[in-house]
A protein has these predicted regions:
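Ferredoxin-type iron-sulfur electron-transfer modules in oxidoreductases and energy-metabolism complexes
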Residues: 1-4, 144-180
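Short polybasic amphipathic segments
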Residues: 90-93, 129-133, 167
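Immediate flanking context of iron-sulfur cluster ligation sites
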Residues: 120-129, 173-180
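Terminal amphipathic helices with adjacent charged low-complexity linkers/tails
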Residues: 8-10, 123-157
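Short amphipathic, charge-patterned alpha-helical segments
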Residues: 107-123
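Short, ordered loop/turn segments at secondary-structure junctions
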Residues: 15-16, 136, 172
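Hydrophobic alpha-helical positions that pack around
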Residues: 1-107, 119
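A structural signal for short secondary-structure junctions
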Residues: 84-85, 97, 125, 159-163
Length: 180
């Protein structure tokens, strides 16, 4: 790794894929070949995790940031984002939007910027109704909050959450009762 003389083996395993496996101890249980159910804590995974060994689990986005932070320094990373939510966030932009796909923006970017400047706006001249963040556990953000800076605290304050970065745009034709 970076000509350090250090190397290691990496095993990639498929888990059960159940929604509950987003919880770290349920994911470990699934990787071990068992039903993906959360484990009681303590012990915490850093002490006794996968196969009863110390384990660090993070999402791919977190691990992808590490090389750039090592190369550029923590101050570089902290120079992006907001006071409480540093760095960038990857979103999977979908729904009623011209430009769907993965995008990475600094924390603090507004929902309006993501939808209209990056996403290209709503097709067919339709009006924006809401955006869902945080997946099934998140919430729907109405038009009155389009200019709120996106970060962990602000999303929670308006009844949603960041989650893993899903961002689904809805237009005037979406029925919020059906969405719920």
């Amino acid at each position: 790794i970076f000509d350090s003389g250090f190397d290691f083996d990496l095993d990639i395993r498929l888990g059960a894929g159940a929604f509950v496996c987003g919880e770290e101890t349920a994911l470990m249980t699934s990787i071990e070949g068992n039903r993906g159910e959360p484990r009681p804590r303590p012990p915490f995974p850093a002490e006794s995790g996968l196969f009863k060994k110390p384990t660090v689990l993070n999402n791919v986005e977190t691990y992808a940031n590490i090389p750039q932070i090592i190369l550029n320094g923590a101050d570089w990373f902290a120079s992006m984002g907001t006071e409480k939510s540093k760095g960038t966030k990857v979103f999977a932009l979908g729904g009623k939007i011209h430009n769907t796909g993965l995008l990475e923006v600094p924390m603090g970017t507004t929902l309006r910027e993501v939808i209209y400047e990056i996403g290209g706006g709503i097709p067919n001249g339709k009006a924006f109704k809401a955006a869902q963040t945080g997946g099934p556990s998140g919430g729907c953000i109405p038009a009155e909050h389009l200019d709120i800076p996106i970060d962990y605290d602000n999303l929670i304050a308006i009844g949603s959450m960041m989650g893993s970065g899903g961002l689904i745009v809805m237009d005037e034709d979406n029925c919020m009762v059906d969405i719920a």
